[in-house]
Amino acid sequence: MRILEFDEKRQAAKLHIESEDDLWILHLILEKGDKVVAKTTRDIGLGKESRRIPMTIVLKVDYTEFQEFTNRLRIHGIIEDAPERFGIRGAHHTINLDIGDEIIIIKQQWNKYALDKLKKQADKRSKIIIALVDFDEYLIAIPFEQGIKILSEKSLRSLNEEEGIIEQNALEVATELAEYVKQYNPDAILLAGPGFFKEEVAKKVNNILKNKKVYIDSVSSATRAGLHEILKRDIIDKIMSDYEIAIGAKKMEKAMELLAKQPELVTYGLEQVKNAVEMGAVETVLLIEDLLSSNNQERLAIERILEDIENKRGEIILVPKESPIYFELKNLTGILAILRFRIN
């Protein structure tokens, strides 16, 4: 995301959308009553027929829809301003926001949390492709902020089939991996697996892709369970420390350990977390995305809590539905805090 302009007087942010993550962030930030200015198209009656006419409109937001990995955010609302000749003011309309589009978001008042989220997203540039490889199977995935996208998950030919099969299988994996690297242009590649096959794949990858950094690590399997395992590792933090999906998994693991050994250093539930925040006791809070994407009083209460946490130098981690810890956190009320010190 690029922040092209921020007009403090109008409380208007002009943004250029560059990725699926950007669309997901806007889905969380946009609220009922906000205004957006964007290009769109609409069917307009012209005599006996109608045509889809491009135009720029001002839309008062009712709600948004985001579907993971579709490259589109749908913004529903009422048209507040549009070219007079079309006579569509007051009509319901949906803006389809895509990667590459520009949009102006106008709020009555941008809160610190939403502004910081925009700035953090604008600063975020790193991308990584993860390939888990074993002699008989492999998995290729790419993390986005809204979750992990599985690009490929396949079996390989048996080692007993013919001579030289290890080298052939390594070339097959490296070739497919190289295609995804060309498509997504990541900053780094992480190759991991239980045996030495990952080194064979790394050699092939380095021959095909000369200018990409390849990290190698061990993992118990080249499966989704292995993917969950690697997301908790320090190597992920080293490569992509700003991706909350990896950080969230590690923080949740820490919270579960504390609940087992020092339960007084963890609290969950909206009121309990709010009380801990007021006492300045919160080190880290994890919350599921649903709590910020609803249009109700609970969302407003949570936003105030998040602002208070940031003012007291606490850490905030949003957990999307696609995160491996989403349901675990949801079962604990959807919001959990790791504390700096014990409270009554």
Swiss-Prot record:
It comes from the Archaea. Coiled coil: none annotated. SUPFAM superfamilies: Dom34/Pelota N-terminal domain-like (SSF159065), L30e-like (SSF55315), Translational machinery components (SSF53137). Its cofactor is a divalent metal cation. It is an enzyme of class 3 (hydrolase). The keyword Nuclease applies. It is found in: Cytoplasm. The keyword Hydrolase applies. Belongs to the eukaryotic release factor 1 family. Pelota subfamily. Monomer. This is Protein pelota homolog. It comes from Saccharolobus islandicus (strain L.S.2.15 / Lassen #1) (Sulfolobus islandicus).
